[in-house]
């Protein structure tokens, strides 16, 4: 397919490369800065542009891999006057109807993964969740997703919002906890790498056990002495201390749900 890629961030970088490897024609890469547009265009093909007025109007598909907050501003400028094209955004929490009244054929292709530009990922194994407003959009978006991923699922906007919420807990919040652990260790001169086997095993366990079955630690047992002592170690950081206590309470309450089932 002939594609124009709008955006040059982490997701756009990996998606652009995957589309190129799948045999698609990346005609242009748009970004607000020429540096970003050129960097991705070098890797994914196509011409870099920084002016929306310079975006070609003969592509089959326009993929908007940009910040969620940019879409309402970007869509009206880009979609008008191209009734034959399919417009796609890649956001987890933005409904498909953000295109309504602006484009004729539109939908969503949401790859659920955490992306960093310089870290390679196997796009074939990334779950991609798709939605289209009509038969043409559904077929184009599904075919596009299947060309880069072996795991493609149809999903409504409402379900995708919940999926993205779950992903925030499973990925973003978890990584923030790694950051907190890193800070605690750094103050004691302990390298973060000592945590890696623990982190790896924690992630590996949920391939075989449910998260609730895999839960361990003082909060599960509600060992009040340890919880109190560890909470006191955080007395100089009220936000971190509050987070520790709330997570401990949540873990204990979830464990009681398990006991009742």
How would you name each of these model-derived features?
Residues 36, 40-43, 120-165, 170-207, ...:
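Internal alpha-helical scaffold of NAD(P)-dependent oxidoreductase catalytic cores
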């Amino acid at each position: 397919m002939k594609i124009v890629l709008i955006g040059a961030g982490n997701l756009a970088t990996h998606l652009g490369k995957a589309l190129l490897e799948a045999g698609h024609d990346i005609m242009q890469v748009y970004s607000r800065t020429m540096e970003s547009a050129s960097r991705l265009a070098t890797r994914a093909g196509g011409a870099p542009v920084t002016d929306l007025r310079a975006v070609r109007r003969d592509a089959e598909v326009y993929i908007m891999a940009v910040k969620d907050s940019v879409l309402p501003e970007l869509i009206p400028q880009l979609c008008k006057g191209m009734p034959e094209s399919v417009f796609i955004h890649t956001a987890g929490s933005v409904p498909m109807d953000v295109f309504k009244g602006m484009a004729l054929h539109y939908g969503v292709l949401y790859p659920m993964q955490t992306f960093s530009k310089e870290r390679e990922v196997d796009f074939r194994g990334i779950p991609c969740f798709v939605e289209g407003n009509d038969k043409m959009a559904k077929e184009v978006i599904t075919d596009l997703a299947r060309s880069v991923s072996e795991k493609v699922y149809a999903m409504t906007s409402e379900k995708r919002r919940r999926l993205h919420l779950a992903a925030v807990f499973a990925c973003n919040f978890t990584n923030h906890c790694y950051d907190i652990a890193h800070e605690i260790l750094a103050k004691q001169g302990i390298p973060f790498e000592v945590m890696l086997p623990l982190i790896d095993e924690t992630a590996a366990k949920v391939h075989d056990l449910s998260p609730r079955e895999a839960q361990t630690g003082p909060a599960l047992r509600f060992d009040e002495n340890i919880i109190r002592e560890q909470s006191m170690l955080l007395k100089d950081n009220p936000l971190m201390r509050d987070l520790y206590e709330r997570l401990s309470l949540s873990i204990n309450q979830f464990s009681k749900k398990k006991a009742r089932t």
